[in-house]
C-alpha cells in the first residue's frame, strides 16, 4: 500500500516517534498527506539526550505536535534482568504507554517506523507491535531503509543520513543486569567520542572494560586520538579495547 493511500484511509493517527530516520520520514509523509497526526516520544533511561533533541527539532520543523512521555523502564525487573527477549518486554511497555496517551487524545490508530528492511524474525520487538495492533506504514508500503534515506534526502530532512541507533541497553551483554549507572556511563562515553567526530559507533561493556566498535573509515581517527581516548574513558572504565571487527 502506498503511503498516500494509507493516510487517505487513516487520516487521523498517532505516531511513535524516536527521532530516527524511519519515524522521521513517516511523520513527514503523514504531514505531507494532510493527515491529522501527533508524535509521541517515550523518554526512558535507554535513550540518550540527543535522540530527544533530534525528535523535538524535527517535530518543530514539520510543525507537528509532539508529546514526551516519561517512563521509568528501570522499575521493570523483567526488562532490567536483560533476557534475550528484553526488546519485546521493553517495546511492550513503551507502546502500551503511547497507546494509552494516544487514546486519551482521541487516536485509535498507532503507527511506528518499522520498514521493509527490518526482519520480523530477528526483532522480538516487532512481536510486541503486532500484539498491540501497531501499524507500520513504511513496511506496508515496501519501503526499504535505503529508499527511506533517499526519500528523506529529497525531502530535505536532516535525518536522511542519521546512523541507525540502538538503545543504550544493547551495549550491556545479555543476562547482565541493567542499571542506571551502567547506562549513564555508556552515554557519557559515547557523547565524548561523538565530540571527536566519530559516527555510527558503539561503546560496549565487557565488565569494567569498554570495547569500541567503529566503522573502518574511523579507525585512523581512533588511533590518532588513542592516548586521549584511553585517558578520558579511563575515568570510568578499567580498560579500553578497539574491536577490529568493524561496523558496516
What is the predicted function of each stretch?
Residues 218-225:
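Short, conserved charged micro-motifs
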Residues 199-206, 243-247:
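C-terminal boundary motif of the adenylate-forming
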Residues 139-145, 149-193, 197-203:
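Mid-to-C-terminal catalytic subdomains of enzymes
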Residues 184, 226-227:
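Charged helix-capping and loop-helix junction motifs
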